[in-house]
């Protein structure tokens, strides 16, 4: 069974990596799918995010990394994936993700959404929080994979 783990991953966090690693034990293949959203101004280009995620997941033989435009369910059909993998941190995540899961099923009844509860040490963590801390010169080394720390630091010069 193939699962898609979609997101912006701008940047990938240890919370994302935790979901990828745990998901890799549940599914034959996981495709980490970076959404190209032209309406957002990302910190890192799609190409850079793909490179970062590939580096962070190179130890997982059943994980591939790709990018896509458009609807997630259309991408899932194209890749013959029947599962969308999502991480849940807090109750508000569940409400939003459940609504999206129902929407996706109205678009394609061949897809299921599987939710994994985020490990408690990452329950507060998001890419937005990482960027906010880094912007003001705070340490993010306990929030992101070590291999992307230099990328983040170079994006936010010291104040």
From Swiss-Prot:
The record marks 16 as: Transition state stabilizer. SUPFAM superfamilies: Nucleotidylyl transferase. It catalyses: (R)-4'-phosphopantetheine + ATP + H(+) = 3'-dephospho-CoA + diphosphate. Its EC number is 2.7.7.3. ATP binds at residues 8-9, 16, 87-89, 97, 122-128. One of its GO terms (biological process) is coenzyme A biosynthetic process. One of its GO terms (molecular function) is pantetheine-phosphate adenylyltransferase activity. It comes from the Bacteria. InterPro entries: Cyt_trans-like (IPR004821), PPAT (IPR001980), Rossmann-like_a/b/a_fold (IPR014729). Substrate binds at residues 8, 40, 72, 86. Its cofactor is Mg(2+). Pathway: Cofactor biosynthesis; coenzyme A biosynthesis; CoA from (R)-pantothenate: step 4/5. Homohexamer. Reversibly transfers an adenylyl group from ATP to 4'-phosphopantetheine, yielding dephospho-CoA (dPCoA) and pyrophosphate. Belongs to the bacterial CoaD family. This is Phosphopantetheine adenylyltransferase. The lineage of its organism: Bacteria, Bacillati, Cyanobacteriota, Cyanophyceae, Synechococcales.
């Amino acid at each position: 069974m193939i699962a898609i783990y979609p997101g912006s991953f701008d940047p990938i966090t240890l919370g994302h990596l935790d979901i990828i690693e745990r998901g890799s034990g549940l599914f034959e293949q996981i495709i980490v799918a970076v959404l190209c959203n032209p309406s957002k101004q990302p910190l890192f280009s799609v190409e850079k995010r793909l490179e970062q995620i590939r580096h962070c997941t190179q130890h997982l033989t059943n994980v591939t990394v790709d990018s896509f435009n458009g609807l997630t369910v259309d991408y899932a059909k194209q890749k013959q994936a029947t599962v969308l993998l999502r991480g849940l941190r807090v109750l508000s995540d569940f409400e939003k993700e459940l609504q999206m899961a129902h929407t996706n099923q109205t678009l394609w009844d061949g897809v299921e959404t599987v939710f994994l509860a985020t490990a408690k040490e990452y329950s507060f963590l998001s890419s937005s929080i990482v960027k906010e801390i880094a912007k003001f010169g705070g340490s993010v080394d306990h929030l992101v994979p070590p291999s992307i720390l230099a990328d983040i630091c170079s994006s936010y010069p010291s104040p």
